[in-house]
C-alpha cells in the first residue's frame, strides 16, 4: 500500500514520534530546555528528537496535533499538561496508537493524532508520552504553544465540550446509572402510511430513552406546530404505526393547560440514539390509551438486528435493500452506559447454585452471535419466578463504555467504539446492582464481551469484588462473549467492582460490554420499578414514598394501558399489589412510577412536508445537504440550471423522514437514491453531498454533531473507512452507478467558500500545465517516478509538465508549494502518505496556506488516507485543498483507505485518458469510468471525489 511501510523485523520494539503540536494559531514550537529534568523522566526514556508543531486558534483552549514518523507495536499515547510545575494527565484512556489503526501492529505506518485542551493557554506546556504494548514508555520533549493563522477545521470547535477530544478516544467515562428498557417492536407500519404522515405538517418528537412523556400545547405552538381545534384528532405515529396516547381531555379545543402523554421508546444504533415520533392534527379521532392492565398473547415484541428496507421493488428487480435499523438499548447523553433492564426468561426455583463459586461458560464469537445478542438484549426484561406470587424478579444491568475508536477491527455494521483498554495496566470498573435478593435460588449470571486488539493469544483474567472468576482466552481480533455463574452472595447492593488483567506481556484487548443478570427484590428504586410478570403471577411492590402510583403496561408499546395502582401504607411507605392477568397470555411488561413523574422529549421539531417518494419527481443533479447548509447551495444550483440541468436541493432530514422513519442513518440515503434511480420520471445523473460526515455520528468523543450528511463505513482489507460511492453502488461492484461528489463542509462560511470556487471556476483562468509529484521509491516495490512517467505520456502535448521527485530534489517541499501557487490545471501525487501529509513533501497546513487564488487545479492523489475526511479531529489534505481560503483546489480525488499502488495506478491512467480525450468530460463521469479499470475493490470503494461531479476542468 502506498503508505510508509517499514519492515516488521526492523521495527520490533522500536517506536519514534515526531510530534506537531497545535494551539489556536500556528507556529514552530521549540523544546523547553531542562523541563523534563525538573519534572522527572517517568519510567521511560526522554526523546531527544525535536518536536515540530502547527497550532491553531480555537474559541477556548489549546488544540494539540502530533505526527509519528513510524510506529511499531504502539499502544498509544498519554498527553500531559504542565501547570505550576505539576504534570497533569489529560486523557482518561490511552490515545489509541498503531495497534488500533491497522491489522499488523508493527507495520510502521505513520499516524496523526490530536487533542483539544479547553483549559490550555499559551503558557501551558505539553508533553506527549508514547506507550508500547509491553508497557514501556517514552516521554518526548516538552512544548509550549505559539500562535499562527486560523484553520478552517477549527472554525466549528464547540465552545463547551464536556470531554477531552482526541483523534480516536471518546473522553472520560461518566458513571451515572439509569434504568432503561428497549422493547422496540418488530412490527413496522406501512411505508405508505409513513409517506402520508411526513407529507403534511407534523410535530417531530425526539425521544432518547424509554419513559412516560408529556408534550404541552404551549410546547407545540413554540415549535411552530398548529395542533388544530380538536384535541381528539391528535394522532401520534412512530415507525409508520399509530401510537396510543392520553390527552388532558377527550374532545374539544386545546388551550394552554392541555397536553398529550404517551409511552415513548429510545433508540440505540451505531448511528443514532434518537427515536422520532410524529404528531399530526388529523381529520379523525386518534388512538387513545385504555385504562385497564392487560396481557398479550405475543408478549415478546423485539427488533432483530436487521430490518427490511422501507420499500420493496418487484421480484424482477435485482436490488432489494435491507434497512439496518439496529435497535438496541437506548442511551442517555453519558458516554459510559450502565443499563438496567429485566428479563422475560423465567428462572426456575429449582435451579442449583454452584457451590464452588463462579462457573465460566464457553465463549462465543462476536460474528456468530452478534445478531442473536442484538435481539436478546431487547427482550431480557424482568421476570418473576414460576409461582403464583412472585417473590423477586430477574434484572439485568449492562455497562457499555464508548471510549476508543478501533478502526482496524473488521466487524461489519457493528460499531467500532469500545471501552477500556486492557494492557499492562489492569482495568477496574464498577457495575451497580439495586436490591439484590440474596435469598433467591440460583446464581447470578455475568456476561463479558471483549475485543482483541493485536494478533496474539489473549488471556484476560476476571475478578468480581475481589474474587477471581476465571479467564477468557481467545486470539487476535476475535470478539469473545463469555458468561460466568456468580453466587448472589458475592454481589453488593450498589457498586460492584470488576477487575480485568492481561495474562501475558504484549497482550492487548478492550472491554466491549459487561452484563449482569441477578435476582432483584420487588422493591421500588427512587419511586419507580420496571419489571415483567407472567400472566399467572401477582406481585407486591414495596418502597414507594407516595400513594399516587401510575402503572403502565407497555407489553405492546403501540397500545399501552395505564391504571392507577392501589397503594397501601406500610412501615416503609407504600406498597402496590399487581393482580394476576389473563391465563392465556405469557407475560406483561410493566412500569410503576409516581403520577407526577413525566419525561420531557429530547427535542421538538416542526416537520417540513416532503414527497421525495413520488415518481413524478425528477432532476439531473441532486444536492443533498444538511438544513444548516441548504441556503448555501443556491449559487451552485442556479449555475447548473443556467447550463440546462434540472437541480433538486434536498434536506437530508426529509430523506430520513421518508426512508428511515426519521432516524439518522446512511441506509436511508441509499434507499432514497435507489428509488430515485428506478422510479423517478427523470433519474438523477449526479449527486453532490454538501456537508461533512463523521465516523462518530453518536458524538461519543464530544467533538460535536458533525455527521451532516453520512458516509457509509465499510470494512476494507485493512481497516474500516468511508465509501461515498456505496450510496449509489446498486450492483455491489464497489463503484458508484450514479457519480457522487462530496463537499465536506461544516459551516455556512465553508460552504460559501467551496461553492464559490466551483461557481467561479473557468478553465481559461488556469495555465495549461500539470504538476507531477513523486515520492522516493527507494526500498519499495513500486516505482512512483515511473508511474508519473506513464501519467505524463497520457497528457496532450500542449500541456506543460512540471516534475518534482523527492528522491532527487532536496527542495521538494518548497518546489511543490511554489508550483501550486503558480497555478496548475492538474496535480498528481504518487507515493506514500497519511491523512494530512504527502511523505516529506506537502501537508494539510501547506494546503491551507496556498495562494494560487482562482488558478485552481484538479488534484489527483495516488496514496493512502488523504481522503480520510470523516475524522472529527483531523483535516485531511483533500478537504484542506478544497477549503483553502486563498487558493488550493477546485476538486480533489483521494482515498479514505489503505491500498496498494497497482490498482491505484491502473485507475489513474484511465482517468487521465478520459480527462484529456477528444471531448470534455464531467469529473464524475470520468471517475466512474476510471474505476472500472481496476479490479481492486478497495480502490473502487475508497477513492472519493471531493468536488462537483457535474463539472469539467477543460
Please report, for each region that a protein language model flagged, where it lies by residue.
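N-terminal secretory signal peptides that target proteins for export/translocation
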Residues: 1-13
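Generic alpha-helix initiation/capping and coil-helix boundary signal
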Residues: 10-15, 20, 919, 923, ...
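Generic N-terminal simple sequence motifs
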Residues: 11, 27-29, 46, 92, ...
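Bacterial N-terminal signal peptides
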Residues: 17-30
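Sec/Tat signal peptide C-region and signal peptidase I cleavage site
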Residues: 32-35
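Cysteine-dependent hydrolase recognition
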Residues: 155-954
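Low-complexity, Ser/Thr/Pro-rich intrinsically disordered linker/stalk segments at domain junctions
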Residues: 37-177, 700
Amino acid at each position: 500500500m502506498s503508505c510508509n511501510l517499514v519492515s516488521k523485523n526492523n521495527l520490533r520494539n522500536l517506536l519514534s514520534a515526531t510530534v506537531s503540536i497545535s494551539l489556536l494559531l500556528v507556529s514552530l514550537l521549540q523544546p523547553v530546555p531542562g523541563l523534563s529534568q525538573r519534572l522527572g523522566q517517568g519510567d521511560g526514556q526522554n526523546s531527544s528528537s525535536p518536536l515540530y508543531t502547527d497550532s491553531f486558534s480555537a474559541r477556548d483552549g489549546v488544540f494539540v496535533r502530533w505526527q509519528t514518523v513510524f510506529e511499531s507495536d504502539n499502544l498509544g499515547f498519554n498527553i500531559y499538561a504542565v501547570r505550576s510545575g505539576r504534570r497533569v494527565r489529560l486523557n482518561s484512556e490511552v490515545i489509541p496508537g498503531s495497534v488500533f489503526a491497522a491489522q499488523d501492529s508493527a507495520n510502521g505506518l505513520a499516524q496523526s493524532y490530536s487533542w483539544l485542551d479547553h483549559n490550555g493557554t499559551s503558557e501551558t506546556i505539553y508533553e506527549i508520552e508514547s506507550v508500547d504494548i509491553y508497557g514501556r514508555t517514552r516521554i518526548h520533549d516538552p512544548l509550549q504553544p505559539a500562535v499562527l493563522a486560523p484553520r478552517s477545521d477549527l472554525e466549528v470547535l464547540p465552545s463547551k465540550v464536556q470531554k477531552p477530544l482526541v483523534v480516536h478516544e471518546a473522553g472520560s467515562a461518566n458513571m451515572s446509572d439509569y434504568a432503561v428498557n428497549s422493547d422496540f417492536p418488530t412490527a413496522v407500519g406501512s411505508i405508505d402510511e409513513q409517506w402520508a404522515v411526513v407529507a403534511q405538517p407534523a410535530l417531530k418528537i425526539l425521544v432518547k430513552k424509554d419513559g412516560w412523556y408529556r408534550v404541552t400545547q404551549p410546547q407545540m405552538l413554540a415549535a411552530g406546530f398548529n395542533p388544530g381545534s380538536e384535541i381528539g384528532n391528535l394522532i401520534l405515529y412512530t415507525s409508520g404505526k399509530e401510537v396510543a396516547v392520553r390527552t388532558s381531555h377527550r374532545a374539544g379545543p386545546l388551550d394552554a393547560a392541555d397536553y398529550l402523554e404517551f409511552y415513548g421508546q429510545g433508540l440505540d444504533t451505531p448511528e443514532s440514539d434518537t427515536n422520532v415520533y410524529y404528531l399530526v392534527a388529523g381529520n379523525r379521532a386518534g388512538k387513545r390509551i385504555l385504562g385497564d392492565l392487560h396481557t398479550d398473547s405475543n408478549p415478546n415484541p423485539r427488533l432483530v438486528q436487521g430490518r427490511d428496507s422501507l420499500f420493496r421493488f418487484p421480484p424482477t428487480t435485482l436490488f432489494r435493500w435491507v434497512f439496518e435499523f439496529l435497535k438496541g438499548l437506548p442511551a442517555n447523553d453519558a458516554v459510559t452506559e450502565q443499563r438496567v433492564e429485566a428479563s422475560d426468561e423465567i428462572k426456575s426455583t429449582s435451579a442449583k447454585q454452584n457451590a464452588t463459586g463462579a462457573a465460566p461458560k464457553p465463549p462465543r464469537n462476536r460474528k456468530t452471535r452478534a445478531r442473536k445478542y442484538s435481539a436478546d438484549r431487547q427482550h431480557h426484561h424482568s421476570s418473576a419466578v414460576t409461582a403464583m406470587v412472585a417473590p423477586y424478579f430477574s434484572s439485568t444491568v449492562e455497562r457499555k463504555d464508548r471510549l476508543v475508536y478501533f478502526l482496524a477491527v473488521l466487524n461489519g455494521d457493528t460499531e467500532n467504539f469500545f471501552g477500556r483498554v486492557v494492557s499492562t495496566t489492569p482495568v477496574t470498573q464498577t457495575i451497580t446492582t439495586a436490591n439484590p435478593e440474596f435469598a433467591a435460588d440460583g446464581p447470578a449470571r455475568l456476561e463479558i464481551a471483549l475485543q482483541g486488539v493485536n494478533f496474539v493469544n489473549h488471556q484476560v483474567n476476571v475478578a468480581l469484588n475481589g474474587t477471581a472468576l476465571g479467564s477468557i482466552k481467545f486470539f487476535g481480533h476475535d470478539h469473545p462473549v463469555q458468561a460466568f455463574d456468580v453466587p448472589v452472595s458475592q454481589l453488593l447492593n450498589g457498586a460492584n467492582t470488576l477487575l480485568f488483567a492481561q495474562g501475558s506481556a504484549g497482550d492487548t484487548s478492550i472491554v466491549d460490554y459487561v452484563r449482569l443478570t441477578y435476582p432483584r427484590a420487588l422493591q421500588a428504586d427512587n419511586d419507580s420499578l420496571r419489571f415483567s410478570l407472567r400472566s399467572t403471577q401477582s406481585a407486591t411492590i414495596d418502597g414507594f414514598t407516595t400513594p399516587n402510583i401510575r402503572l403502565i403496561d407497555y407489553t405492546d408499546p403501540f397500545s399501552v394501558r395505564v391504571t392507577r395502582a392501589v397503594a397501601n401504607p406500610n412501615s416503609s411507605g407504600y406498597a402496590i399489589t399487581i393482580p394476576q392477568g389473563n391465563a392465556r397470555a405469557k407475560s406483561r411488561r410493566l412500569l410503576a412510577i409516581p403520577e407526577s413523574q413525566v419525561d420531557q422529549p429530547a427535542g421538538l421539531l416542526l416537520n417540513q412536508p416532503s414527497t421525495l417518494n413520488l415518481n413524478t419527481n425528477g432532476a439531473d443533479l441532486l444536492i443533498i445537504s444538511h438544513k444548516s447548509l441548504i441556503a448555501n447551495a443556491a449559487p451552485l444550483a442556479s449555475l447548473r440550471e443556467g447550463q440546462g440541468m434540472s437541480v433538486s436541493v434536498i434536506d437530508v432530514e426529509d430523506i430520513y423522514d421518508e426512508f428511515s422513519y426519521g432516524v439518522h442513518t446512511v441506509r436511508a440515503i441509499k434507499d432514497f437514491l435507489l428509488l430515485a434511480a428506478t422510479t423517478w420520471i427523470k433519474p438523477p445523473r449526479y449527486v453532490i453531498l454538501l456537508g461533512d460526515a463523521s465516523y462518530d455520528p453518536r458524538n461519543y468523543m464530544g467533538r460535536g454533531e458533525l455527521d451532516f450528511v453520512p458516509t457509509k463505513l465499510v470494512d476494507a482489507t485493512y481497516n474500516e473507512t468511508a465509501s461515498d460511492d456505496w450510496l449509489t453502488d446498486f450492483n455491489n461492484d464497489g463503484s458508484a452507478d450514479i457519480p457522487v461528489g462530496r463537499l465536506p463542509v461544516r459551516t455556512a462560511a465553508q460552504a460559501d467558500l467551496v461553492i464559490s470556487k466551483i461557481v467561479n471556476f473557468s478553465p481559461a483562468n488556469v495555465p495549461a500545465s500539470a504538476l507531477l509529484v513523486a515520492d522516493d521509491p527507494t526500498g519499495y516495490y513500486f516505482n512512483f517516478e515511473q508511474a508519473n512517467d506513464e501519467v505524463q505520456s497520457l497528457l496532450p502535448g500542449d500541456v506543460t509538465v512540471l516534475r518534482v521527485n523527492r528522491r532527487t530534489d532536496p527542495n521538494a517541499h518548497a518546489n511543490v508549494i511554489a508550483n501550486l501557487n503558480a497555478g496548475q490545471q492538474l496535480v498528481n501525487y504518487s507515493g506514500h502518505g497519511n491523512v494530512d501529509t504527502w511523505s516529506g513533501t506537502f501537508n494539510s497546513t501547506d494546503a491551507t496556506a496556498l495562494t494560487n487564488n482562482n488558478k485552481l487545479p484538479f488534484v489527483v492523489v495516488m496514496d493512502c488516507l488523504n481522503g480520510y475526511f470523516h475524522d472529527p479531529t483531523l483535516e485531511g489534505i483533500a478537504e484542506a485543498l478544497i477549503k483553502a481560503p486563498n487558493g488550493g483546489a477546485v476538486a480533489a480525488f483521494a482515498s479514505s483507505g489503505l491500498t496498494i499502488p497497482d490498482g491505484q495506478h491502473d485507475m489513474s491512467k484511465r482517468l487521465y485518458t478520459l480527462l484529456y480525450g477528444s471531448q470534455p468530460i464531467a469529473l464524475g463521469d470520468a471517475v466512474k469510468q476510471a474505476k472500472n479499470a481496476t479490479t481492486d475493490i478497495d480502490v473502487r470503494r475508497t477513492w472519493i471525489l471531493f468536488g462537483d461531479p457535474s463539472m469539467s476542468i477543460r
